[in-house]
Amino acid sequence: MSERIKTAALRDFSVSLCRAAGLSADDAALLTDSILFAECRGVTSHGLLRLPQYIARLRSGATASNASMPFTMESGGTARLDAQNGLGQLAGRKASDKAEELAAEYGVSFVAVANSNHFGTGAWYAIPAARRGFFAFNISSAASAMAPHGAAQPLLGTDPVGLALPRGEGKAPLALDMALSTAARGKIRYAALNGTPIPETWGLDAHGAPTTDAAAVLDGGTLLPAGGAKGSGLAIFIELLCAVLTGSGALGGTGLLSDLSRPAGTGHIFGCVDIKRFLPLKTFEALCEESLSRVTSLTPSQPGGEILLPGEPEERRAAESAANGVPVAPALRDTLNALAEELGCAARI
């Protein structure tokens, strides 16, 4: 059974491990913030589970621990950052801050990031920008895991999309953070572990046939895009923007986080729109609330059901985590404590 651990204790532990792996105090705190943002919101696939992978890449040199990440181009509302194979979260934060800065000056911004790594959850960047009055978006390339529509082999990444806009005082921004596969790879792994069948729409086996066997999807098979041709088409566009436009490489060239033999070569795009350039922010927020109330006031499709807006389930989990601590599975806890011992770090959870 998972034991709940206070966020402050998890933060101290994660920072200690990151410092032991060679990160500066500031960089360790930033990476930890990204990890706990995801963990506290229930997005466990991008939370503490990722910490051993990030540290393994840092220790092996697959990810650079001291990249300076210069901006190699700035023109009007656009910019390009070379992450120099540094941590994706550090590059992403620097780029998203630049996107806000440029949007404040020019009204809109478009910032490309080349030669990066896995950047965590898109909402971690978009929500703070939305709180400051911007519509914010981000997209990223990812390692090949998903077949293009009609194909039997993986080529596309799950290519996450993050969006957020402000809703006014006292309300969390409306936020959408999603990958473009029908189901997350983590869900399929969980089904395989428990021997439970999956819907045929989730993946193909190694022969290109739809399957309800989760293990067959993972063993030489492929994930399928959400919405068939629609999700596939959107993923192709994201790959061309994030891989090709940024200068990171060609479609399908992004490396796996677990592959310590090479740089990941991940590309990202960050952008912001300064809402008050179009209409007063308060007016925008009021009209959004009126519009969203029309959604939530509809009759639920299931008796006793509830209509939730994008990001609301995660905000509820975050509030629960803040009040009661974060549930950490025993196996993950053991893994993290073993890693701490290996690093010569005294911290434990």
Named regions from a protein language model:
Residues 146-216:
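Phosphate/diphosphate-binding glycine-rich loops and adjacent basic-rich segments that engage nucleotide
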Residues 4-6, 10-13, 20, 250-349:
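Catalytic-core signal marking the mid-to-C-terminal active-site face
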Residues 78-168, 175:
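A generic, well-ordered mixed alpha/beta core segment in the N-terminal half of proteins
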Residues 185-250, 258-263:
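Small-residue-enriched flexible segments
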Residues 15-26, 33-44, 56-63, 101-105, ...:
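Generic secondary-structure signature for well-ordered alpha-helical cores
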Residues 46-100:
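Active-site cofactor/substrate anionic-group-binding motifs, chiefly glycine-
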Residues 3-7, 24-47, 63-74, 261-265, ...:
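N-terminal glycine-rich anion-binding loops that anchor highly charged ligand groups
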